């Protein structure tokens, strides 16, 4: 959901947008894609109709994806900016697709720390590894920037004024419905 405001902005600015759907959450993706305004190309990298919620399903998705990444090259991606977000298997698959095809990997909300690689596995591994692969890392505070420096990332760290969650809240029309001084987080 956090990439949709970026997608809509790119479309509004007449950029060609290609959305790669990795297949981890096809049911959720179907509803989110409806929030995209304008023309874009939609590529289903792995076909599926049900959201994957088991480790066996995730392992199968990873194996199928790795074979496709290794044997199916996309020359049109070379030197293009390719945006990923999150700490799921889809994020890692997206990063592998981009790097295999020599695209420029952009990671939104980079540098979020974690309590230990094994305490929050595989999300912590994905967050760290995708940051190491990224050409551009978007952060919104100094703590995240410091974390990326500690991780010795090679990509360029870019600081933005606010977290992309604000754009996401606006997308689902919640920003104007919340009380400014009252927040509940679960």
Question: What kind of region is each of these model predictions?
Answer:
Residues 1-5:
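A short, glycine/small-residue-rich beta-strand->loop->alpha-helix junction that serves as a flexible
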Residues 12-65, 148:
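Conserved nucleotide-sugar phosphate-binding/catalytic loop shared by glycosyltransferases and other
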Residues 22-27, 133-186:
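A nucleotide-sugar donor-handling region in carbohydrate enzymes
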Residues 113-135:
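A conserved, positively charged/aromatic
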């Amino acid at each position: 959901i956090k990439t949709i405001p970026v997608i809509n902005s790119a479309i509004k600015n007449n950029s060609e947008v290609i959305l790669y759907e990795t297949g981890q959450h096809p049911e959720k993706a179907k509803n989110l894609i409806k929030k995209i305004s304008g023309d874009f190309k939609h590529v289903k990298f792995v076909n599926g109709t049900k959201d994957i919620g088991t480790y066996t399903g995730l392992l199968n998705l990873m194996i199928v994806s790795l074979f496709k990444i290794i044997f199916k090259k996309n020359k049109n991606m070379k030197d293009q900016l390719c945006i990923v977000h999150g700490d799921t298997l889809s994020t890692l698959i997206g990063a592998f697709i981009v790097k295999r095809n020599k695209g420029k990997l952009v990671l939104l909300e980079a540098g979020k720390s974690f309590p230990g690689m094994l305490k929050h596995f595989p999300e912590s591994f994905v967050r760290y590894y995708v940051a190491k692969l990224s050409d551009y890392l978007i952060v919104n505070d100094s703590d995240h920037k410091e974390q990326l420096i500690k991780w010795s990332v090679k990509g360029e760290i870019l600081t933005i004024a606010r977290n992309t969650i604000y754009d996401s809240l606006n997308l689902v029309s919640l920003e104007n419905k919340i009380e400014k001084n009252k927040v509940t987080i679960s």
